[in-house]
Amino acid sequence: MGQKSNPNGLRLGIIRTWESKWYDVDKKVPFLVGEDFKIRPLIKNHYPKSTISQIEIKRLKKSNDEFIEIDLYTSKIGIIQGPENKNKNSLINKIEKLINKKVQINIFEVKAINKIAVLVAQNIAMQLQQRAFYKAVLKSAIQKALKSGVKGIKIIITGRLGGAEKARRDSISMGVVPLNTLRADIDYAFEEAHTTYGVLGVKVIINHGEVLPNKTIADTRQIFSSQYENKKNNNKRHFADKKNFKKSTS
């Protein structure tokens, strides 16, 4: 039987970029990868579910490897920061104690939570843990996603559905979800729901459309707030100014 590859990993280097952005000598790479695997679950466990959609870890300067910059993308900035930044500062202290390095955390707000596969999967898992009927939960999630403007969505759930004695698999989909089209912006997430009947697996696959030339994932998804858009536009202007400077000097 053929096995399906992870849609996120399949598009790395084509339309998607890595969530850990750094480089170093070969001897240090395993150690730094291990650090990333420690940092990510620490951040996820520090906050409640359906709060953080993406974590980016950056070590941009090779000479200054004692400094780490972490970008958190969230729909609930108030929970991430806390009163007087208490939650954010306590998280920084935990990470610095864990890896013994200086840490800076940047927070970016996402506005369309029903278009992000991670948040949709976590929300479904939370409702299943609260003993909601799984078919109603899936239909509600799909309707909200389609209203927010996605091209297609597919949700797969496995386990003892509805408390049945035998585990089975059920899925529901609407719209177009082309997993083999590499230029299609496919957002994939997996989450577990721990219920009294056992563990249920939830997979969410969302199609945001095709990433055409001179466009990025941010253009197809349109999930970020004005703060992220300003940062992206400033970066575009910076690179454009560099190109114009090179042309004028040549």
Curated annotation (Swiss-Prot):
GO CC annotations on file: cytosolic small ribosomal subunit
Residues spanning the membrane: none
Keyword Oxidoreductase: no
Keyword Metal-binding: no
GO molecular function: mRNA binding; rRNA binding; structural constituent of ribosome
Pfam family, one: Ribosomal_S3_C
GO biological process: translation
Highest rank taxon of the organism: Bacteria
InterPro entries attached to this UniProt entry: KH_dom-like_a/b, KH_dom_type_2, KH_sf_prok-type, Ribosomal_S3_C_sf, Ribosomal_uS3_bac-typ, Ribosomal_uS3_C, Ribosomal_uS3_CS
KH type-2 domain residues: 39-111
Keywords attached to this entry: Ribonucleoprotein, Ribosomal protein, RNA-binding, rRNA-binding
Function: Binds the lower part of the 30S subunit head. Binds mRNA in the 70S ribosome, positioning it for translation.
Family stated for the protein in its record: Belongs to the universal ribosomal protein uS3 family.
Subunit structure: Part of the 30S ribosomal subunit. Forms a tight complex with proteins S10 and S14.
Name of the protein described by the UniProt record: Small ribosomal subunit protein uS3
Organism expressing this protein natively: Ziziphus jujuba witches'-broom phytoplasma
Lineage of origin: Bacteria, Bacillati, Mycoplasmatota, Mollicutes, Acholeplasmatales
